[in-house]
Swiss-Prot record:
<feature type="binding site">
    <location>
        <position position="474"/>
    </location>
    <ligand>
        <name>Zn(2+)</name>
    </ligand>
</feature>
<dbReference type="GO" id="GO:0015031">
    <property type="term" value="P:protein transport"/>
</dbReference>
<feature type="region of interest" description="Disordered">
    <location>
        <begin position="295"/>
        <end position="345"/>
    </location>
</feature>
<feature type="binding site">
    <location>
        <position position="450"/>
    </location>
    <ligand>
        <name>Zn(2+)</name>
    </ligand>
</feature>
<keyword id="KW-0926">Vacuole</keyword>
<keyword id="KW-0653">Protein transport</keyword>
<feature type="compositionally biased region" description="Low complexity">
    <location>
        <begin position="92"/>
        <end position="106"/>
    </location>
</feature>
<dbReference type="InterPro" id="IPR032350">
    <property type="entry name" value="N_BRCA1_central"/>
</dbReference>
<dbReference type="GO" id="GO:0050832">
    <property type="term" value="P:defense response to fungus"/>
</dbReference>
<dbReference type="InterPro" id="IPR013783">
    <property type="entry name" value="Ig-like_fold"/>
</dbReference>
<feature type="binding site">
    <location>
        <position position="471"/>
    </location>
    <ligand>
        <name>Zn(2+)</name>
    </ligand>
</feature>
<dbReference type="Pfam" id="PF00569">
    <property type="entry name" value="ZZ"/>
</dbReference>
<keyword id="KW-0072">Autophagy</keyword>
<dbReference type="InterPro" id="IPR053793">
    <property type="entry name" value="PB1-like"/>
</dbReference>
<dbReference type="InterPro" id="IPR043145">
    <property type="entry name" value="Znf_ZZ_sf"/>
</dbReference>
<dbReference type="Pfam" id="PF00564">
    <property type="entry name" value="PB1"/>
</dbReference>
<dbReference type="InterPro" id="IPR000433">
    <property type="entry name" value="Znf_ZZ"/>
</dbReference>
Length: 862
């Protein structure tokens, strides 16, 4: 007993997915590969001869192509349910889909040079039966059955017959649907009107058919074969009967409507008789028979001269003989509103009705035949002029290349294809593979990697670095997903600019007027938007790193510039935003007049501060703010170093003269011009110290072991330029009550033999700076400062300080080469900040904070 089941087959073509069930008998699919293709062609309305490529996903997840029945059997062995198949039209068959063709046209858009005899016959018959009126449907079906059975080799005649029936049905259907007024037919089915006459009342011309002179054109027997005489006669007779019957029904139905025409009686004549061995070949440009009854509003056709030449630039094609032999072949040509026809041939005059027939949309008058041959052949074809230039792209699907414009059948001599017709095929929505990301740009945002502005496509915002963005290319090279946020679309603004011309980005961007370049980072503001802004110019006094004694009062002055596009209003303040609180005030109002500070003007801003009590490094951040509290512009800061040594009293008068020693300054003994005089005594008395002075002896004894290296003595300069708070102090020798005095030493002069005691006096002078307690305090202060900078290894810091003789700047440089700042410097280099010396200075200034260093570098670039 056969086991029956079913399998679900899902077929996808482009964006369309269809499914159907197929029977499975004894584990075999009840469809072969041919049946499967036919089913898919039916589902997606492909042309029956379309070439498909079918693929599916097998049990291993691979894409496999279905070629033959063995592949289907292999599918069944895999037990795939549902079976998912992807269909793809081959490159040459994408235009062969049935739904893309114009209705009623039996000729493909790309006509092959040799067509099968009964190509698309069934589809033609189906199209005809939809449009033929009900009284004729049975007769037509009978005629078609007889023709199919008796005329196996007369494919061209059957094709012509089916087209004639189709056009007749279309004409009936269109006239009935639109309610247009039809006119009574003139003539009979057996007679041919003679002469080229118009109606007596000046109305529309009668439509006539004359005899066409025989032409010696090459027969198309190579294409279709020699038709049988009996089949040809039978097909022609059936066609004539069918057309005559249609005319009778049309005349009976519209006879009572002809009285509505005033001034003239419109007359229309269809092709009503055909001689034997002749083809029914009066066609419009899209391959259909001309069987329309036109009604116009104005009885006066457009005036045309008899010697009218073909329109310049339009293609010209020769008539094609479709007869069975050269001797008997005759071709009917059609001429709309032609005043005269050549006496040697025949023409079909179609009345002008103010609009163009179906398939001839928006055409100027065109002579299809060559003007050189028009006189001899007597055949011409003119298309109605509708008062404006043609939209030629509408003819794209109507006139195929290398095809006769009358019948749609490929020609033998391959006439020149139209040159001025633009064959535009409207793109489907599924043909657009762009996801739209390439056309989106982030306005006002610059890539910090490559500098492109604006960033086009995805934007990557750094989580670690403030105001740091990358484009997709730079992110692929240097970024990682953990540190960045992807933003596919830009931020929306209250009044965004128009995106009307964003598609013109490729090579058609309008040049911007020259403006002052502004680096807008992060989310940024719109260019040209009114805003308050400020820029730091310089420190007027109290430079960064100034050493002060505890609790010293001082005033810091910054010079600021208004670099925005708004005037700073009166009431603008400098407010404290963070850091150490060195002032008892949180805001200081700027000295601005009622008119405000104009753009590009500078202003000195002063704030009173007090140094903290404890030693260390202190920094306070300030920023400008409007009267409403809105902060703007670059921030400024004050950076000081509090040293407790400057306020600790020492023994003797010698030490007071050396208070405020700045260990950060380089040695000052190399670039001295002229004699460097050290005046230790305010009132020098004796050259040598008195032996009764116990304080001096104690100092000399305590420093005797330390000052063995004389080079160390010279590396301690005396520079009071950065000292704050000790200008009012005097080193009077009477304060201590000691009669000891020291001489004035001229370092440029060579010591004489008489002054042999001067070196010992110099040792006594520098002794307080090198005592054990002083070294310990200096070392602890420098170690604390290094620890605040980020150098946590105390032993290494001590070693470096002692090696550099407590030179803080040199020690920091050495520590940067061997300690924790190497990764920070390397990271700054990767960000694009390659000035190593500048990076070191900023790291020292910002206590090793990479965030603050980056912000300072960005502010410096601006």
């Amino acid at each position: 007993m056969a086991m029956e089941s079913s399998i679900v087959i899902k077929v996808k073509y482009e964006e369309t997915l269809r499914r159907f069930n197929a029977c499975v008998i004894n584990e075999k699919l009840d469809l072969d590969i041919g049946g499967l293709r036919d089913k898919i062609i039916q589902l997606f309305n492909f042309a029956h001869d379309a070439e498909l490529t079918l693929t599916y996903i097998d049990e291993d997840g691979d894409v496999v192509t279905l070629v033959d029945d063995e592949d289907l059997q292999d599918v069944m062995r895999q037990d795939l349910n549902p079976l998912r198949i992807s269909a793809r039209l081959n490159a040459g068959e994408r235009s062969g889909r049935a739904s893309a063709r114009s209705s009623g046209n039996s000729t493909p858009l790309r006509s092959p040079r040799v067509q099968p005899p009964f190509l698309n016959l069934n589809s033609r018959v189906s199209d005809v039966l939809k449009y033929i009126p009900e009284p004729l449907r049975e007769s037509v079906m009978k005629v078609c059955s007889d023709m199919t059975a008796s005329a196996s080799s007369s494919a061209p005649i059957l094709a012509e017959l089916v087209d004639a029936m189709s056009e007749m049905g279309l004409s009936y259907y269109q006239n009935q649907a639109s309610g247009s007024q039809a006119v009574k037919e003139a003539g009979s089915c057996s007679g041919i009107s003679k002469g080229n006459t118009k109606s007596a009342d000046g109305g529309m011309p009668n439509v006539k058919i004359g005899e066409s002179s025989p032409k010696k054109n090459r027969p198309l027997t190579a294409l279709h074969g020699e038709p049988k005489p009996n089949a040809s006669n039978e097909a022609v007779d059936a066609s004539v009967k069918l057309v005559c019957k249609s005319e009778t029904l049309e005349g009976d139905r519209t006879e009572d409507l002809s009285s509505s025409f005033k001034g003239s009686k419109a007359q229309t004549s269809l092709v009503n008789s055909l001689e034997k061995d002749k083809k029914f070949d009066v066609r419009s440009l899209d391959g259909r028979t001309i069987g329309y009854a036109y009604v116009r509003n104005s009885p006066i056709p457009p005036e045309k001269t008899s010697d009218e030449q073909p329109s310049k630039g339009h293609p010209v094609a020769k008539p094609v003989d479709l007869g069975g032999s050269a001797s008997s072949s005759k071709v009917k040509q059609c001429n709309w509103d032609s005043p005269n026809a050549d006496s040697s041939g025949s023409s079909i005059n179609m009345p002008y009705d103010g609009f163009t027939p179906s398939g001839l949309v928006h055409l100027n008058t065109v002579n299809v035949n060559d003007s050189h041959n028009a006189g001899s052949s007597g055949s011409s074809m003119k298309m109605p002029y509708d008062g404006f230039r043609p939209a030629v792209r509408h003819l794209g699907p109507l006139i195929p290349v290398n095809a006769c414009p009358f019948s749609g059948v490929p020609t033998v001599n391959n006439p020149i294809p139209p040159q001025n017709f633009s064959f535009e095929v409207p793109l489907k929505r599924s043909h657009n593979h762009s996801d739209g990301t390439g056309t989106i740009f982030h306005k006002g945002v610059r890539c910090d990697g490559c500098g492109v502005h604006p960033i086009t496509g995805p934007r990557f915002i750094s989580k670690v670095k403030e105001n740091y963005d990358l484009c997709s290319i730079c992110f692929a090279e240097m970024g990682n997903d953990a540190d960045y946020i992807r933003m596919d679309r830009p931020l929306t603004y209250p009044n965004p600019w128009s995106f009307k011309s964003l598609h013109d980005l490729h090579g058609r961007l309008r040049p911007r007027p020259p403006t002052v370049p502004q680096v807008i980072r992060g989310f940024g503001l719109k260019a040209g938007r009114p805003k308050l802004d400020s820029r730091f110019i310089q420190d007027v006094n109290v430079l960064d790193g100034t050493i002060m004694a505890p609790l010293t009062r001082f005033t810091k002055i910054w010079r600021m510039k208004n670099n925005g596009n708004l005037v700073w209003p009166q009431g603008t303040q400098l407010v404290w935003i963070g850091g150490d609180k060195l002032s008892d005030r949180f805001s200081v109002e700027l000295e601005i007049t009622t008119a405000g500070l104009a753009v590009d003007q500078e202003l000195d801003v002063a704030v009173d501060f007090t140094a903290p009590e404890h030693p260390g490094r202190y920094i306070s951040y300030w920023r400008l703010a409007s009267a409403s509290g809105q902060k703007f512009g670059q921030r400024v800061w004050v950076l000081i170093q509090v040293d407790a040594l400057l306020s600790v009293p020492k023994k003797g008068l010698v030490h007071e003269a050396f208070q405020g020693l700045n260990l950060n300054l380089p040695p000052a003994g190399s670039g001295v011009s002229g004699p460097d005089i050290i005046n230790v005594n305010s009132e020098p008395q004796n050259v040598l110290p008195e032996p009764k002075s116990s304080s001096t002896m104690e100092l000399v004894d305590s420093v005797a072991e330390v000052n063995q290296n004389k080079e160390q003595e010279a590396k301690f300069p005396i520079n009071d330029s950065l000292l704050v708070g000790f200008g009012d102090k005097s080193s009077s020798p009477s304060a201590s009550g000691s009669p000891i005095s020291y001489p004035v030493i001229d370092l440029t002069e060579k010591p004489s033999a008489d002054s042999s005691m001067q070196p010992s006096a110099a040792v006594a002078m520098q002794a307080p700076l090198q005592d054990a307690r002083g070294n310990f305090e200096v070392e602890m202060s420098l170690l604390q400062e290094l620890e605040e900078m980020g150098f946590k290894q105390v032993d290494l810091n001590k070693e470096i300080l002692r090696k550099n003789e407590y030179d803080l700047e040199q020690s920091v440089d050495d520590l940067c080469g061997v300690a924790e700042w190497d990764p920070i410097l390397e990271e700054l280099k990767e960000m694009g900040f390659c000035d190593k010396e500048m990076n070191k200075k900023l790291l020292k200034k910002n206590n090793g904070s990479i965030k603050r260093v980056v912000m300072d570098l960005i502010a410096g670039e601006q």
